[in-house]
């Protein structure tokens, strides 16, 4: 981050603190010091970088060797459930939008897929437009909504306006996330609410996902 910021000429101030209540402390800083966006990293098990994969494999091996024989729930040892709770705490306790970054060998965000599942997700199009201004890349919208989705007409109008007003943007024909949905994309924008849904019901597809930014309003 510091390297990229220096290349872009952006100034970043680093800050280090030790706390056993990290979420509370971070949210306190965000709220009391007037920040307008909070960006946090996801757990290592969601990453596909070599070091993080190795760490996840070691953790799995350690659990299977020492804990499984005692029938201890994996949730005691694996941070998946804890991460969900922690992310929820960041979102609920912060007075600003929150982004959770999932690193999947991130290099650049030049080909972006934006997942829209409800009227509430339309705010992602604003993030996509801002992103394209800096990357000069392209964005494609995957509209998961159906004719029975509340606000369906508003969703269609919002996406149509986005694809007409912003260069290098398209609406994908497909309506659902599959492993093939991510072919050709190196970045995904998705809302926290929709992420919770697809992470439960489209686990196979997410194995192929690119680097991702999970956003809350």
Report the location of each language-model feature.
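Charged docking surfaces used in two-component/phosphorelay signaling
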Residues: 16-24
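Membrane-proximal soluble helical/coiled-coil segments
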Residues: 1-13
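Intrinsically disordered or low-complexity boundary/linker segments at protein termini
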Residues: 9, 24, 36, 40-217
């Amino acid at each position: 981050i510091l390297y990229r910021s220096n290349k872009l000429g952006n100034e970043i101030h680093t800050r280090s603190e030790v706390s056993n209540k990290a979420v509370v402390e971070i949210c306190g800083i965000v709220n009391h010091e007037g920040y307008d966006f909070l960006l946090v990293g996801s757990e290592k098990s969601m990453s596909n970088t070599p070091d993080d994969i190795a760490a996840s494999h070691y953790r799995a091996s350690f659990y299977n060797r020492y804990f499984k024989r005692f029938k201890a729930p994996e949730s005691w040892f694996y941070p998946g459930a804890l991460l969900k709770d922690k992310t929820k705490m960041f979102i609920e306790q912060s007075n600003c939008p929150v982004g959770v970054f999932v690193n999947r060998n991130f290099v650049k965000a030049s080909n972006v897929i934006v997942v829209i599942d409800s009227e509430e997700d339309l705010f992602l199009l604003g993030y996509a437009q801002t992103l394209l201004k800096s990357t000069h890349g392209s964005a494609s919208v995957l509209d998961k909504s159906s004719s029975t989705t509340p606000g369906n007409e508003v969703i269609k109008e919002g996406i149509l306006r986005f694809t007409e007003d912003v260069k290098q943007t398209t609406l994908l024909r497909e309506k659902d996330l599959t492993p093939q949905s991510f072919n050709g994309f190196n970045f995904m924008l998705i809302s926290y609410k929709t992420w919770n849904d697809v992470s439960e019901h489209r686990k196979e597809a997410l194995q192929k996902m690119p680097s991702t930014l999970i956003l809350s309003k």
